[in-house]
């Protein structure tokens, strides 16, 4: 996009993405045209699993969760799926078994923390930093807090309240080989089907 920039007094060229993108490249640097009706991004678990119907909203029992935190440390999920949409397709995992138990106990609605494209999470796992917590540092110690703060701008922990593209699923929650274009949409839909 070529625009006049008063601060520089010149016409500048900027690379931008479509704010209404439904598909993006890794780290959201480019928009990708995605046909949302394409059967290749409609997994059977999403197409064939109906959403439960709750006629009276007063009957909802809601469980809120964060996509990454749900499975990031769950060793019953294959490592490459931890912290991703695809963890919700692992029905024998600790997390999914726990959700099934909650469902049997009356929980009937899952509320996800933001899953749209988030501005400040590095989508490539290799670019995500992990805090180096000093041995013996307590959870509320200054050392632990300093280690977390040192990588806060480059880690994968973020509640998601800094949207970049409202209509596209967050790429860091997709498995490494499925972060581009419609592939992350497919994995998001797999999660939805898995939760139903």
Which residues are covered by each model-predicted region?
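N-terminal structural segment of carbohydrate-active enzymes
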Residues: 1-179, 185
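Extended, hydrophobic alpha-helical segments in both membrane/secreted and soluble proteins
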Residues: 184-196
């Amino acid at each position: 996009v070529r625009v006049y920039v008063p601060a520089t007094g010149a016409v500048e060229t900027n690379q931008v993405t479509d704010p209404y993108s439904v598909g993006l490249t890794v780290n959201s640097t480019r928009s990708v045209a995605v046909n949302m009706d394409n059967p290749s991004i409609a997994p059977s678990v999403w197409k064939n699993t109906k959403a439960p119907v709750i006629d009276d909203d007063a009957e909802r029992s809601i469980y809120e969760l964060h996509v990454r935190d749900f499975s990031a440390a769950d060793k019953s999920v294959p490592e490459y799926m931890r912290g991703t949409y695809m963890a919700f397709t692992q029905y024998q995992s600790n997390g999914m078994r726990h959700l099934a138990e909650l469902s049997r106990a009356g929980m009937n609605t899952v509320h996800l923390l933001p899953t749209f494209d988030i501005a400040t999470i590095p989508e490539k796992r290799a670019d995500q930093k992990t805090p180096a917590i000093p041995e013996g540092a307590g959870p509320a110690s200054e050392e632990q807090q300093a280690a977390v703060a040192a990588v806060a701008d480059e880690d994968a922990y973020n509640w998601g309240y800094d949207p970049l593209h409202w209509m596209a699923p967050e790429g860091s929650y997709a498995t490494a080989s499925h972060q581009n274009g419609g592939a992350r949409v497919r994995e998001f839909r797999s999660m939805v089907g898995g939760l139903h």
